[in-house]
C-alpha cells in the first residue's frame, strides 16, 4: 500500500483549499469530495487503492470544513451549488489539471455534479453517491412529504442563527444524532 496522504494547500480566487494527495504526480487525476458531516478521512480506505492503481488522488476539505479558508474577510460565505462547483474547478486550476475524474457523496456529490454540468470539458468522469445531484431550487419552495421533512430537520435548523450556535456549541452531539437517524 502507498503512504498516507501528504497535505498541501492550493490557492484559488476565493479559497485556500487544504487537500491531501497520494499516488504518482503524473497519475490520472481523481478528486474525492466528502459530504457533511464528514471530511477527507471518509476516504481513508479508498485512497491507497486508487493510488496503487496509478491515480493521482486529491482529497480536499470543502469550503466550511477543516483548515480550508476563505482568502478574504469580505468574501460572501455561500453554500450555493454554483459556488461549490466553482470551488472544484478552482482547485483543478490551482493544481494545473486540465480535467479529472470527480467522485463525491452528499455535498461532495453535489459539487461534482455541478462542476460536471457547468464545465463538462474539465470532467473526465463522474461518480456521485447519496448526493443531492443538481438541486431544483424552485422545487425547494414547496414542502416534501412529512417523513422526508422529518429526515431533513437539520437542514432547516442550519438555516438559522440558533442552528449555527447549536453546531458551534455541541458539534459532536449534533453529528451523533445525525448518524443515528
Q: What is each residue range found by the language model?
A:
Residues 9:
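N-terminal carbohydrate-binding accessory modules
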Residues 18-73:
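Conserved HGGG/HGGXW glycine-rich cap/lid loop of the alpha/beta-hydrolase fold
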Residues 12-16:
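Glycine-centered tight beta-turn/hairpin loop motif at sheet-sheet or coil-to-beta transitions
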Residues 2-6, 17, 29, 65-103, ...:
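Flexible "cap/lid" subdomain of the alpha/beta-hydrolase fold that forms the substrate-access gate
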Amino acid at each position: 500500500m502507498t503512504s498516507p496522504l501528504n497535505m498541501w494547500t492550493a490557492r484559488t480566487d476565493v479559497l485556500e483549499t487544504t487537500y491531501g494527495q497520494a499516488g504518482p504526480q503524473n497519475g490520472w487525476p481523481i478528486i474525492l469530495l466528502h459530504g457533511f458531516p464528514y471530511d477527507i478521512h471518509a476516504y481513508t480506505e479508498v485512497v491507497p487503492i486508487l493510488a496503487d492503481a496509478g491515480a493521482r488522488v486529491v482529497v480536499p476539505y470543502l469550503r466550511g470544513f477543516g483548515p480550508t479558508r476563505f482568502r478574504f474577510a469580505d468574501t460572501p460565505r455561500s453554500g450555493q451549488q454554483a459556488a461549490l462547483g466553482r470551488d472544484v474547478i478552482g482547485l483543478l486550476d490551482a493544481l494545473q489539471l486540465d480535467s479529472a475524474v470527480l467522485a463525491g457523496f452528499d455535498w461532495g456529490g453535489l459539487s461534482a455534479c455541478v462542476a460536471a454540468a457547468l464545465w463538462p470539458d474539465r470532467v473526465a468522469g463522474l461518480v456521485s453517491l447519496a448526493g443531492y445531484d443538481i438541486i431544483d431550487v424552485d422545487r425547494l419552495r414547496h414542502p416534501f412529504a412529512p417523513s422526508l421533512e422529518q429526515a431533513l430537520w437539520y437542514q432547516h435548523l442550519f438555516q438559522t442563527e440558533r442552528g449555527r450556535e447549536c453546531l458551534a456549541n455541541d458539534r459532536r452531539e449534533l453529528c451523533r444524532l445525525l448518524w443515528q437517524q
